[in-house]
């Protein structure tokens, strides 16, 4: 009986504390993303000499940046002219590109501050 009580308390904790915090986080991210899209649309923006874009997923906002297909180096703002040689990388995939972590940091800073 005591174990059943602990299980019930656990679910009450999850649904009353944790779930509302996650929902609030997603609401704030969606508001920031909506404001960004109203101002800039779906275009890549030059932030810190890198081309950045954002997408909204069920898990929140993801920053995307462009890299060269061949060299895997981040594209600079002037590379937008050669769009066929570029691929988009999300900051979630950026673990492969540890040296480029500051690009993602700057992108999220621009969106939320």
Swiss-Prot record:
Show the Pfam families listed in the entry. Answer: Pox_A21 (PF05323)
Statement: the UniProt record of this protein carries the keyword Zinc: no
Give the UniProt subcellular location, in the record's own words: Virion membrane
Q: How does it sit in the membrane?
A: Single-pass type III membrane protein
Family matches, as InterPro entries: Poxvirus_A21
Listed under GO cellular component are:
membrane; viral envelope; virion membrane
Q: What keywords appear on the UniProt entry? A: Disulfide bond, Fusion of virus membrane with host membrane, Membrane, Signal-anchor, Transmembrane, Transmembrane helix, Viral envelope protein, Viral penetration into host cytoplasm, Virion, Virus entry into host cell
Transmembrane intervals? 1-23
Listed under GO biological process in this entry are:
membrane fusion involved in viral entry into host cell; symbiont entry into host cell
Give residue spans on the Virion surface membrane side: 24-113
**PTM text:** Contains two intramolecular disulfide bonds. They are created by the viral disulfide bond formation pathway, a poxvirus-specific pathway that operates on the cytoplasmic side of the MV membranes.
The task this protein performs is described as: Envelope protein part of the entry-fusion complex responsible for the virus membrane fusion with host cell membrane during virus entry.
What family is this? Answer: Belongs to the chordopoxvirinae A21 family.
Q: What is its quaternary makeup? A: Envelope protein part of a stable entry-fusion complex (EFC) which is at least composed of proteins A16, A21, A28, G3, G9, H2, J5, and L5. Formation of the viral membrane is necessary for the assembly of the complex.
Q: What is this protein called?
A: Virion membrane protein A21 homolog
Origin organism of this chain? Fowlpox virus (strain NVSL)
């Amino acid at each position: 009986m005591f174990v059943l009580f602990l299980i019930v308390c656990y679910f009450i904790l999850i649904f009353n504390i944790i779930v509302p915090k996650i929902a609030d986080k997603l609401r704030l991210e969606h508001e920031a993303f909506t404001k960004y899209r109203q101002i800039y649309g779906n275009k890549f923006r030059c932030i810190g000499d890198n081309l950045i874009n954002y997408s909204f997923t069920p898990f929140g906002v993801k920053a995307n940046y462009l890299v060269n297909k061949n060299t895997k180096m981040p594209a600079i703002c002037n590379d937008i002219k050669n769009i066929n040689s570029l691929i988009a990388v999300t900051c979630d995939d950026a673990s492969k590109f540890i040296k480029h972590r500051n690009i993602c940091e700057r992108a999220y800073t621009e969106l939320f501050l």
